[in-house]
Design a protein with these regions (language model features):
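Hydrophobic faces of well-ordered beta-strands that scaffold small-molecule active sites
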Residues: 24-28, 64-66, 101-105, 154-158, ...
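Hydrophobic h-region of N-terminal signal peptides that target proteins for export
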Residues: 7-19
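Substrate-binding cleft and catalytic face of glycoside hydrolase catalytic domains
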Residues: 54-213, 219
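Aromatic-rich peripheral "rim/lid" segments of glycoside hydrolase catalytic domains that contact
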Residues: 41-42, 173-176, 261, 265, ...
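Residue-level detector of functionally pivotal "anchor" positions at catalytic/ligand-binding pockets or at interdomain
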Residues: 368-392
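Boundary/entry segment of secreted carbohydrate-active catalytic domains
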Residues: 21-52
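Glycoside hydrolase catalytic-domain groove-lining segments
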Residues: 49-53, 192, 203, 207-214, ...
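C-terminal tail/sorting-segment detector
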Residues: 405-415
Length: 415
């Protein structure tokens, strides 16, 4: 019995070591707002969870992402509230829960994405040279404050979905023109400006958080030629970064074959970078976008969402270069007036407060443990575990309903 316990501990230690290079979690930038509104998060049994981040960690999630706006105070969208003080507090909680922290600089007062990369109002009068210095100083100051607050980031995005550049100008200035945009056919001056901004932001990251990994976030997943043009330019300009970050939403980016093509293309280019899916999500109720519709394969139901998640993870786990998976806005929960009710790809049932099945699939990305790994040996010598598991390590929420082979109490069980 002592020998079995020793072997178990050795296996568990090895398992943890192997898993440490992969990260799974979500962008939980609105969690404090739900908590302030009195939203109750529950576990699979319906019991209220007193510490949501501890619960996430216990369920196998090991990293969380938080967005940061420069000055969100004038935005009408209630979801745009993440100023530096907000992010420091949430970041500290994430770190105290033992998880990795990904900091997502938007370098804007509002949402930054391929359609809009508006310059913060306070920076609108700066020349390009002044803007290079500002992004360096701002990034450096934010990171200094994050460190002082006990919220040192482990991964840093220098821009959000910057496929076509960043800091185009204010919305009033840049909405109806292509100034400062970085398309494949854009003037080299636009790209040079963009690259200088990235280099200055990256310089601040290396100085203040030398252990953190820098992520360049591109969402041109369905257009590999456009995506690789972006990263070819980064390589040619010797931009300093560690991770290629991608967005992948089936409703906007196509089916899993499109994602696999993108991953294969990136790997064949041999950029020497890890790849992370820093944003993903799939609906449990109705379409979140109109570009593509895969409801015939993955119905807009809890089970359809779970199946998509399982298939996504199976695909990602075939690619050794992919070491991160983050669900966007998984914490959306309850029926409080926290923000506009348009997102229906969360991982919580708004009526029951319990996680959807897809929530429990996420940990398969890093390789969930099995009942064999969680055995313990009480004095009377009876071997026990913490539940029923599939042979590939997925914990069930009760006794299995389908026939098959399972693990229970450290032994194979045929149902």
């Amino acid at each position: 019995m002592k020998w079995r316990g020793f072997l178990l501990g050795s296996l568990l230690t090895c398992s943890i070591g192997l898993q440490a290079q992969k990260y799974v979690g979500g962008d939980i930038s609105l969690l404090p707002k739900y908590e302030e509104a009195g939203v109750v998060y529950r576990n699979a049994d319906g019991q209220a969870v007193s510490d949501v981040l501890a619960f996430f960690s216990e369920e196998g999630l090991n990293a969380m992402r938080v967005r940061l706006f420069v000055d969100p105070s004038h935005d009408y969208d209630k979801a745009v509230c993440q100023d530096l003080d907000f992010v420091k507090k949430l970041g500290k909680r994430i770190k105290e829960a033992g998880m990795q922290l990904m900091l997502d600089f938007h370098y804007s007062d509002t949402w930054a994405d391929p359609a809009k990369q508006w310059t913060p109002a306070a920076w609108k009068s700066l020349s390009n040279e002044e803007l290079y210095q500002k992004i360096y100083e701002y990034t450096k100051d934010c990171l200094q404050q994050m460190k002082a607050a006990g919220a040192t980031p482990d991964m840093i995005q220098t821009g959000n979905e910057i496929s076509y550049g960043m800091l185009w100008g204010t919305e009033a200035e840049a909405k109806n023109n292509q100034n400062n945009r970085c398309y494949t056919t854009s003037p080299e001056a636009n790209w040079n400006r963009f690259i200088n901004l990235l280099k200055q932001a990256g310089k601040a990251c290396r100085e203040e958080c030398p252990q953190a990994k820098i992520i360049l976030h591109n969402e041109r997943t369905p257009k590999p030629a456009v995506m690789t043009d972006f990263f070819d330019r980064m390589k040619a300009a010797d931009v300093d970064y560690d991770i290629i970050g991608l967005s992948y939403y089936p409703d906007y980016h196509g089916d899993l074959n499109s994602l696999e093509t993108a991953l294969n293309t990136l790997e064949n280019k041999q950029y020497g970078k890890s790849i992370m899916i820093v944003e993903t999500g799939y609906s449990y109720a109705w379409a979140i976008g109109s570009d593509f519709n895969y409801s015939s394969t993955y119905p807009y139901t809890e089970e359809g969402q779970r199946r998509f998640t399982a298939d996504l993870i199976a695909l990602l786990n075939k690619h050794a270069s992919v070491n991160g998976l983050f669900w966007w806005w998984p914490e959306d929960n309850g029926n409080k007036d926290v923000t506009q009710r348009w997102w229906n790809a969360a991982l919580y049932n708004h009526d029951t407060g319990k996680p959807y099945a897809a929530f429990y699939e996420l940990k398969q990305f890093v390789g969930a443990g099995t009942g064999i790994e969680t055995l313990y040996f009480p004095k009377e010598g009876k071997v026990q575990s913490n539940g029923w598991f599939t042979v590939d390590g997925r914990k069930l929420q009760g006794e299995p309903n389908e026939k098959g082979i399972y693990i229970m109490n450290g032994r194979k069980a045929v149902n």
